């Protein structure tokens, strides 16, 4: 059987993994085996937290819209319900940005809506 020399390929693979975990503490950034485990754990965490970030941001947007709506005398669920009745499908991110950055515009939106249908 012929001899296969692939030393630099293995070194390249190990260096790539060590570069990935270079910000870790202690042996996790120095030793290959622990670095490999750290990389696997990091990839699991980042995959999980991508979904969590989406949920957290949606909660933040809803909280901001609710605070701005209550400042104008309407609860969040009534506000959203009325938007759906008028077939104005809300983008919560945009509504939250309007509520935070331009409260006058948000209060104008609320005042232009008629809440008679909802309050029945």
From Swiss-Prot:
Gene Ontology CC annotations of this record: chloroplast; ribonucleoprotein complex; ribosome
InterPro entries documented for this protein: Ribosomal_bL20, RIBOSOMAL_L20_CS, Ribosomal_protein_bL20_C
Cysteine disulfide partners in this protein: none
Keywords: Chloroplast, Plastid, Ribonucleoprotein, Ribosomal protein, RNA-binding, rRNA-binding
Localization per record: Plastid, Chloroplast
An individual GO BP term: translation
Keyword Metal-binding attached: no
A Pfam family that the UniProt record links to this protein: Ribosomal_L20
Listed PROSITE patterns: RIBOSOMAL_L20
GO molecular function: rRNA binding; structural constituent of ribosome
Role summary: Binds directly to 23S ribosomal RNA and is necessary for the in vitro assembly process of the 50S ribosomal subunit. It is not involved in the protein synthesizing functions of that subunit.
PANTHER family: 39S RIBOSOMAL PROTEIN L20 (PTHR10986)
Homology family: Belongs to the bacterial ribosomal protein bL20 family.
Protein name: Large ribosomal subunit protein bL20c
Organism the protein comes from: Pinus koraiensis (Korean pine)
């Amino acid at each position: 059987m012929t001899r296969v020399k692939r030393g630099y390929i293995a070194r390249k693979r190990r260096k790539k993994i060590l570069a990935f975990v270079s910000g870790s503490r202690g042996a996790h950034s120095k030793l290959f085996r622990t670095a490999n485990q750290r990389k696997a754990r990091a990839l699991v965490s980042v995959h999980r937290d991508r979904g969590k970030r989406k949920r957290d941001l949606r909660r933040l947007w809803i909280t901001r819209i609710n605070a701005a709506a209550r400042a104008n005398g309407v609860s969040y669920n009534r506000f959203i319900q009325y938007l759906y009745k008028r077939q104005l499908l809300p983008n919560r991110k945009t509504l939250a940005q309007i509520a935070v950055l331009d409260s006058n515009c948000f209060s104008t939106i609320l005042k232009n809506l008629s809440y008679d249908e909802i309050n029945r």
